[in-house]
Amino acid sequence: MFFEICVALFVIFTILVLFTLISNWGNGPLTDLTHSMKDKIVVITGGSRGIGLETTKDLLRQGATVIMGCRDSNQANKALESISNLSQKSRCFYMHLDLTDYENIKSFVEEIKSKYGKIDILINNAGSCFRNFTLSDGIELTYFTNHLGHLILSCLFLDDFNPKGRIINLVTTKYKRVWESTLDKFTSNSNLDFSYNRKGYDWMKTYILSKLAGVHLSQYLGDYCTNQKIDIKVVSVHPGFINNHFFRDIEKHSIYWFIRDFCQTPYRWCMFKDNVMGAQTTLHCCYMEWEQLSNGGYYRDCHYEQLTHIGLLKNAQKLIAFDKAIIEKNNIVKGDKKIMQIFK
């Protein structure tokens, strides 16, 4: 009996050790960089929850002033309440931001300029995924929120960065799963009404396309800033696969999903990152010396990684041309010259 108990305890101990080792491997590295952010102004979209909130908290600890652009005021207020350090809380501010509303984005930028002058870092962190096909001003909502809204926001801020500015776009490594033929169909003139998405709407494919667009935005805008001699570097960051409710909230609609979610829980605990670890690569790109940051580059697990063919500038130019066409077709930015100039 004693022997059986010892064997059982040994097995349990071994499983726990393996679980911990695998979990630590899945979490990826912590950034080994720290940098004083005193007097730095950082704007982050979707900074009130998940990896955005952890990014916000770390930046505050380093001395930055952080403006969270969020759509949900209740969630933003909860985020502010979660910051216990009074000194840090005094440097954190919430402003309403709806990335599918050009007028709101414009007023958001103008208010920040009037209150803070120029900014140092823009983190395009916000992301959404809509289960059902939905249009907003003629544009599919996931694409509008995750990409087009951030494109508009970035363009409106371009002239209002302090020297050595940074734009950080959060994307996903799943961008690699998009075939060039799929991108060509998506960016064709026949898809200006998003008809490609209407039939057999695949919300995951649409989400991945919107994140590929973030990679393309970094490539295109980084190249534009270099050519125009604008002192800004633009990068993409894959935060990792995060064990939070982002996708589970979208699909929580059936007993099938509940069972699948329950069965996947051990795998997520082992292989997915928590929110703190998910923020590390974004923070790495905030704290890295500006000269070492690769303009247009893609970062994963606190390291630079070469883009695959689908993410390169040649394909980025196709997608940005598509963006221009849908913006003009739907009169999204009312002919705003600050935005339209990047398409020339």
Where are these predicted regions, by residue range?
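Terminal signal-anchor or tail-anchor transmembrane helices
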Residues: 1-27
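Rossmann-fold NAD(P)H-dependent dehydrogenase/reductase core
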Residues: 3, 22-251, 329-343
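A short C-terminal helix-loop "cap" of Rossmann-like NAD(P)-dependent dehydrogenase/epimerase domains
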Residues: 193-197, 254-267
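Active-site rim elements
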Residues: 200-208, 266-272, 306-312
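C-terminal/domain-terminus segments
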Residues: 230-232, 236-238, 297-313
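C-terminal helical subdomain
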Residues: 264-306, 317, 321-322, 329
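C-terminal amphipathic/interface module of NAD(P)-dependent oxidoreductases
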Residues: 307-344
